[in-house]
Regions:
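C-terminal TM-helix exit segments that contain a strictly Trp-centered aromatic cap at the helix terminus
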Residues: 3-11, 76-85, 150-155
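Hydrophobic alpha-helical transmembrane segments
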Residues: 31-44, 101-122, 175-187
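Juxtamembrane helix-loop-helix connectors linking adjacent transmembrane helices
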Residues: 1-43, 54-60, 85-108, 166-169
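Membrane-interface helix/loop boundary segments of multi-pass membrane proteins
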Residues: 44-76, 80-97, 128-136
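Hydrophobic/aromatic residues in alpha-helical transmembrane segments
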Residues: 3, 53, 122-126, 186-190
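C-terminal membrane module of polytopic membrane proteins
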Residues: 143-201
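Functionally important transmembrane alpha-helices
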Residues: 68-71, 93-98, 102-169
Length: 201
């Protein structure tokens, strides 16, 4: 994901947040804390999606279909949330269904489309890694952890300029995940499969 952040910086989409006043101690502390959070996220999500779900689906479907279904779950669940926060006195038997409906509407909201596609490609990339490389669950956890950590650090150190002429390369989801990430991971996968074909030739 480093090339993505380099492009975002040089296109002035990511602009250094000059209001932050860092000391070496604060920077290291923040880096370590976010690494711990990122590791936990990577461990849980990869164990679930590329571990339990993908392995289970591979028993019933071709590998490509299993990767696609897993990736759709992975991308969709990132948006399965509701903003409404009803008061205790307002909760009724239908409240849960209302919140669930709002959560599912977030998944199909056109505003989130570029981020959903990018996260779908993240899922496909990790699925290919899981199925093509031995002892790959650890690599998936490592990749996922490093990406989450980089995004968290980027959001702390930089501001996203949504007025940039290149703002279409990112989404409002987190200021990073968007078309640029989707294109980068797609190009990486295409390059990998071309390399695999040339090895067989």
């Amino acid at each position: 994901m480093i090339p993505v952040f380099i492009v975002l910086y040089f296109l002035n989409i990511n602009v250094i947040d000059e209001t932050q006043h860092w000391t070496p101690f604060l920077l290291v502390r923040y880096m370590v804390l976010n690494l711990g959070v990122a590791l936990l996220i990577g461990l849980v999500e990869e164990s679930l999606f590329r571990g339990i779900v993908l392995v289970g689906l591979k028993r019933k479907f071709p590998v490509a279909i299993a990767i696609l279904i897993t990736s759709l779950y992975f991308a969709g669940l990132h948006f399965l949330s509701a903003k409404a926060d009803p008061l205790i006195d307002d909760v009724t038997l239908s409240t849960g269904f209302s919140l669930l409906g709002e959560a599912f509407r977030n998944v199909v909201d056109p505003e989130h489309l570029s981020a959903v596609v990018a996260l779908l490609m993240v899922g496909v990339f990790l699925g290919v890694l899981r199925t093509q490389v031995n002892v790959s669950l650890g690599l998936c956890i490592g990749c996922h952890t490093s990406w989450v950590w980089q995004i968290k650090m980027s959001k702390k150190l930089f501001n996203t300029d949504f007025n940039s002429p290149y703002q279409y390369l990112v989404s409002h989801y987190d200021g990073v995940v968007g078309p640029l990430v989707a294109v980068w991971l797609s190009a990486t996968l295409i390059g990998y499969f071309i390399y695999q074909q040339t090895k067989k030739a």
